[in-house]
Amino acid sequence: VHLTAEEKSAVTALWAKVNVEEVGGEALGRLLVVYPWTQRFFEAFGDLSTADAVMKNPKVKAHGKKVLASFSDGLKHLDDLKGTFATLSELHCDKLHVDPENFRLLGNVLVIVLARHFGKEFTPELQAAYQKVVAGVANALAHKYH
């Protein structure tokens, strides 16, 4: 991902304030509600029948936290996202057969959740930087598909 020094600094500074558990659970939950076809990968999570059930589901929250913990690792290695996410890309491609488009969707949902949580602090410039990051992460996760 090609970020300016200012963008890297702003992305890192905001991320330090992120509650990974809360934001991760909300982002994954919203993905499953807004794009219901993504639920097929999470059938073992139990009740996903309503938006309320999804957003309160402890397995969704736990996996969302796990997803954002991986995203945090990516932020520490912005110059080598493909290397950082190689194992996860392989898992999602070869074993889980996740549509790589879902990574892009989740990235966009994450940006929305960050905007919701940080309000005015999530400036258009910061959003632009985060869009670059989530696009880079989605690309790295889709790498094994190519």
Curated annotation (Swiss-Prot):
This is Hemoglobin subunit beta. The keyword Iron applies. The keyword Methyltransferase does not apply. Coiled coil: none annotated. Red blood cells. Involved in oxygen transport from the lung to the various peripheral tissues. GO terms for biological process: hydrogen peroxide catabolic process. It comes from Balaenoptera acutorostrata (Common minke whale). The modification N6-acetyllysine is found at residues 59, 82, 144.
